UniProtKB/Swiss-Prot annotation:
A GO cellular component entry from the record: cytoplasm
Pathway recorded for this protein: Amino-acid biosynthesis; L-histidine biosynthesis; L-histidine from 5-phospho-alpha-D-ribose 1-diphosphate: step 1/9
InterPro entries linked: aa-tRNA-synth_II (IPR006195), aa-tRNA-synth_II/BPL/LPL (IPR045864), HisRS-like_core (IPR041715), HisRS/HisZ (IPR004516), HisZ (IPR004517)
GO MF entries: histidine-tRNA ligase activity
Organism: Rubrobacter xylanophilus (strain DSM 9941 / JCM 11954 / NBRC 16129 / PRD-1)
Pfam family, one: tRNA-synt_His
Amino-acid biosynthesis in keyword set: yes
Taxonomic superkingdom: Bacteria
Family, per entry: Belongs to the class-II aminoacyl-tRNA synthetase family. HisZ subfamily.
This protein's name: ATP phosphoribosyltransferase regulatory subunit
Subcellular location: Cytoplasm
Function: Required for the first step of histidine biosynthesis. May allow the feedback regulation of ATP phosphoribosyltransferase activity by histidine.
BP GO terms, sorted: histidyl-tRNA aminoacylation; L-histidine biosynthetic process
């Protein structure tokens, strides 16, 4: 166990400092993802890190949250996710504006329960929420945007990642119609992907009901193939048809978006959150045992805040996304050494040509400058010279005396 003195100057459990080049990559991916959101007209919002505990209703989320008390002894939570704070924001700040509201964000969230489960206690989510429309077109549109954002970050659909799409209302509706007394336990087991428990609970049911309880979670296949939905019709009598028709409409529109090949159907997917009411989806990436993103429709959540508006959206875990991206060659960086006016002018001129320049004022010898350049992942070292720059690639031979324009072409090329 670490001493109190050692703990005092270290990061807290589940958190870490992020250094270059990882921090640079994380911010670059965030920029690309937000750029796709903006291209689709989504407007960014920022909510407080602290919310009153009453804002978060779902027990699992409240249990996972970091808790503290304000001077009035009111319990506060560090936000464990972003959907509920945005639902509160819409009901509180946008109640007089016309829907739909298309909002985006990229903010840190905090969860105690995630420590040791593939996620830090503090991690960054980037996502969108569409509030005020029940149209399946918005479900399809957000899924298509999710695929587009992941592509912009550097993943390729199919080979690098797959969107797994389900319909929370279909399985839940089947259970509530057929075996309401066992439905909560079955839904809890399926949400936790505990198929052994699903099988155990199914044995207590009449054969026809047990067949659906076991069979629906096994309905998995490509979204471009109609076999899954055809098989699902066996379990749709008595009220499940509307959920399947909703799913068909979403798939048709995903085809119009050109994103159907990136989607796999799984009718056993009901989502991790209690508030999902319709289409629900998760994104899995090659080489990672955890989801990179998840989302779905939550038509009842805003009722808690006095605004009965339907909604849908998704969140991307940026740290997980960065962890599965292919390696990238670092951006070119030039360490320019010199403390006189000539060095300042050379740095300005190079930056004017688009060259990233780290200017070090001082008298570093070439060997010292190269060692420093390696420490900051720079590929080039330079010194100001009459008419241009003396330039050397790290680890290579002597210097070239080049005009600023030629030096810029060499560094950027």
């Amino acid at each position: 166990m670490r001493s109190r003195a050692a703990r005092k100057f270290s990061t807290t459990p589940g958190t870490r400092d992020v250094l270059p080049p990882e921090s640079t990559r994380l911010l670059d991916v965030q920029r690309r993802v937000l750029g796709r959101f903006r291209l689709h007209g989504f407007r960014e919002v920022i909510t407080p890190a602290l919310e009153y505990a009453e804002v978060v209703e779902e027990a699992r989320l409240r249990d996972s949250a970091f808790k503290l008390f304000d001077p009035d002894n009111q319990m506060l939570l560090l936000r464990p996710e972003m959907t509920t704070p945005i639902a509160r924001l819409v009901s509180q700040r946008l109640r007089n504006a016309p829907p739909p509201f298309k909002l985006s964000y990229s903010l840190p969230v905090y969860r105690r329960s995630e420590v040791g489960r593939g996620q830090s206690a503090e991690f960054h989510q980037a996502g969108v929420e569409v509030v005020g429309s029940a149209s399946p077109g918005e479900d399809a549109g957000t899924i298509a945007l999710l695929v587009e954002a992941l592509e912009a970050a550097g993943l390729g659909p199919g080979e690098d990642f797959m969107v797994v799409l389900g319909q929370a209302a279909f399985y839940r509706g089947f259970l509530e119609r057929s075996c309401p007394e066992v439905a909560p336990a079955l839904l809890s087991a399926l949400a936790g992907k505990d198929l052994v428990r699903v099988e155990e609970l199914s044995r207590r049911l009449p054969d026809a009901v047990a067949a659906g309880a076991r069979g629906i979670p096994r309905l998995v296949g490509p979204a471009s193939d109609g076999a899954v939905l055809e098989e699902a019709e066996r379990y749709a009598s008595g009220g499940g048809g509307a959920a399947l028709e909703n799913l068909r409409a979403i798939l048709e529109l995903l085809g119009a978006h050109g994103r159907l090949e990136a989607v796999m159907l799984d009718l056993g997917l009901i989502g991790r959150h209690d508030y999902y009411t319709g289409a629900v989806y998760e994104v899995y990436a090659a080489g990672l045992g955890f989801t990179v993103a998840n989302g779905g429709r939550y038509d009842n959540l805003l009722r808690r805040f006095g605004e009965p508006l339907p909604a849908t959206g998704f969140a991307i875990s940026l740290e997980r996304l960065v962890s599965v991206l292919p390696p990238e060659r670092p951006a070119p960086l030039l360490v320019l050494v010199g403390e006189d006016a000539e060095a300042v002018r050379a740095a300005r001129a190079l930056r004017g040509e688009g060259v990233p320049v780290l200017h070090v004022s001082g008298g570093l010898a070439p060997e010292e400058a190269e060692r420093y350049a390696r420490s900051v992942d720079a590929r080039w070292v330079g010194y100001p010279a009459p008419g241009g720059v003396k330039l050397r690639e790290v680890g290579e031979g002597g210097f070239w005396l080049l005009a600023v324009e030629e030096a810029a072409r060499r560094v950027l090329g």
